[in-house]
Amino acid sequence: MIRSVNRTGALMMALILSGCVMKQQQPAPVEPTQPVEPVQPVPQPEQPIPQPQPVPQPPKLVTINWDASVEPLVAQMVRAATVTPGSVLLVDRIKNSTNGALQGEKATSAIQNALNNNGKFTLVSSEQLAQAKQTLGLSPDDSLNSRSKAIGLARNLNAQYVLYSTAKGDVKSPTLQMQLMLVQTGEIIWSGNGVAQN
């Protein structure tokens, strides 16, 4: 009986294994490689070198004759203001409320030049102004541009008056407004208007 099981098992194995025989596939054909000649790059046609474009000119600032523009207003203020001779005056940097760039430093210098040796006011020097701005933590280039800042700075400098100026309207021909203010109260004691001259 053991023999018949062995024979039956062997026969069974032979049948199973005979069913697993697969078709043999042909190996993929091997193609011999041909040496490839290196491809020469196609020369690109020379591109024209772009010509430099002219640099556009920045818009020119309109030249305003600040001395001629501010002198009549300053003369009017000195005649009209009833102040004690020798009173200390802080000239605030002109505020630009025009529609463009304004030469604010030149305008402020023209106001200061017109006020020099007028007999009524002693001007705060630029050194004193820079020192006071530093003490208050303001940038040396800070244009105060507000009456409250200007009055606060004037109090720090022991000035009695502040001249607050504004340029308004078209930058080519701005309207100038000046206001002389009493530092102690902030009261405007004189105000004048004029048109800048080219």
From Swiss-Prot:
GO terms for biological process: peptidoglycan biosynthetic process; regulation of cell shape. A lipid is attached at residue 20 (S-diacylglycerol cysteine). Residues 26-37 have a biased composition (Low complexity). InterPro entries: LpoB. Regulator of peptidoglycan synthesis that is essential for the function of penicillin-binding protein 1B (PBP1b). HAMAP family: LpoB. A lipid is attached at residue 20 (N-palmitoyl cysteine). Residues 26-59 are annotated as: Disordered. Pfam families: LpoB. It comes from the Bacteria. It is a lipid-anchor. The gene is lpoB. The keyword RNA-binding does not apply. This is Penicillin-binding protein activator LpoB. Interacts with PBP1b. It comes from Pantoea ananatis (strain LMG 20103).
